[in-house]
């Protein structure tokens, strides 16, 4: 009987915690900003980081305030580029690195991330 009580208690606790987490809402000024935010979150970025990169705001409650469209700076674009590149290109190396990696994989992961950084920075310099 005690086992059932513990299970029911844990189930109720998880429902309450889930409700608390759902109450915060991300409000984005455009569909593009929403797509950037969602991609960032899917890639493992925190709510705060993804909101900063995309120009979205995290608000409590269920209603978004009227947002002015923020000016997206080159720095935010560069950070998003680096995050997306690292996630999509370097993911397999990083996954292997986290299992039973040797020094070769550590170096490969670092070089991959550096290449993403260089690529994104080079692109922004050329277009500026």
Swiss-Prot record:
User: Which superkingdom is the protein from?
Assistant: Eukaryota
Q: Please list the disulfide bridges.
A: 27-64, 28-56, 40-50
Look up the signal peptide feature and give its range: 1-24
Propeptide residue intervals: 67-128
Check the record and name the InterPro entries matching this protein: Thionin, Thionin-like_sf
* GO MF terms, alphabetically ordered: toxin activity
What tissue specificity is annotated for this entry? Answer: Expressed in trichomes, that are stiff epidermal hairs located on the surface of petioles and leaves.
One GO CC annotation: extracellular region
Q: Organism, per UniProt?
A: Urtica ferox
- What is stated as this protein's family in its record? Belongs to the plant thionin (TC 1.C.44) family.
Q: Where in the cell is it found?
A: Secreted
UniProtKB keywords? Cytolysis, Disulfide bond, Plant defense, Secreted, Signal, Toxin
GO BP terms, alphabetized: defense response; killing of cells of another organism
Function recorded in the entry: Plant defense protein that causes pain by probable disruption of cell membranes. Shows cytotoxic activity against the neuroblastoma cell line SH-SY5Y and slightly weaker activity against several non-neuronal cell lines. In vivo, intraplantar injection into mice causes several nocifensive responses, along with swelling and redness.
Protein name (database record): DELTA-urthionin-Uf1a
């Amino acid at each position: 009987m005690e086992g059932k009580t513990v299970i029911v208690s844990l189930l109720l606790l998880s429902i309450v915690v889930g409700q608390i987490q759902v109450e915060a809402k991300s409000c984005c000024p455009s569909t593009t900003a929403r797509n950037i935010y969602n991609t960032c979150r899917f890639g493992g970025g925190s709510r705060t980081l993804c909101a900063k990169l995309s120009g979205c705001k995290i608000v409590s409650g269920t209603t978004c305030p009227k947002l002015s469209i923020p000016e997206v700076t080159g720095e935010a674009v560069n950070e998003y580029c680096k995050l997306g590149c690292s996630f999509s290109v370097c993911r397999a190396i990083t996954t292997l690195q986290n299992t039973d990696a040797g020094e070769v994989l550590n170096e490969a992961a670092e070089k991959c991330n550096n290449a993403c950084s260089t690529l994104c920075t080079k692109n922004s310099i050329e277009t500026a």
